[in-house]
Amino acid sequence: MKIALIAHDRMKEQIVQLAMAYESILAKHDLYATGTTGSRIMEATSLSLTRFLSGPLGGDQQIGAMIARNEMDLIIFLRDPLTSQPHEPDIIALLRLCDVHKIPFATNLGSAEIMLKALELGQLDWREVVREENEA
């Protein structure tokens, strides 16, 4: 599965802690992240991942391009709900694309943990079927 890890500035420590706690699960998948988030995760874990630009500089859109091609299977985007984000339209576009392509989108620590536990149990394997249907 291809998983994107994204976090707003005030949430970066939480996503690093999440990656550390679920490293054994995440290590079995192809990981992608926006710039700073990816750097922080790689510094704290032994996970390898593909890093895109920082979110406000286009990293969200790079991940969005993969979503538009139905090349992502899970998005974990720990958002800061209390701070206005200048790239909010990009975030809304990601959410919309995930809805179009039936890609799970976790926006907080609770939903991210549930998704990762479901991933471990094989409960997101249906994504492979959805991907194949869209390729046909």
UniProtKB/Swiss-Prot annotation:
Active site as annotated: D60 (proton donor/acceptor)
Enzyme Commission code: 4.2.3.3
Keywords: Lyase
GO biological process: methylglyoxal biosynthetic process
Gene3D superfamilies, sorted: Methylglyoxal synthase-like domain
GO CC terms: cytosol
Domain MGS-like positions: 1-136
GO MF annotation list: methylglyoxal synthase activity
Transmembrane segments annotated in the record for this chain: none
Keyword flag Transport: no
One Pfam family this sequence matches: MGS
Residues that hold substrate according to the record: H8, K12, T34, G35, T36, T37, S54, G55, H87
Reactions catalysed, as given in the entry: dihydroxyacetone phosphate = methylglyoxal + phosphate
Role noted for this protein: Catalyzes the formation of methylglyoxal from dihydroxyacetone phosphate.
Similarity comment: Belongs to the methylglyoxal synthase family.
Protein name from the UniProt record: Methylglyoxal synthase
Organism: Brevibacillus brevis (strain 47 / JCM 6285 / NBRC 100599)
Gene of this entry: mgsA
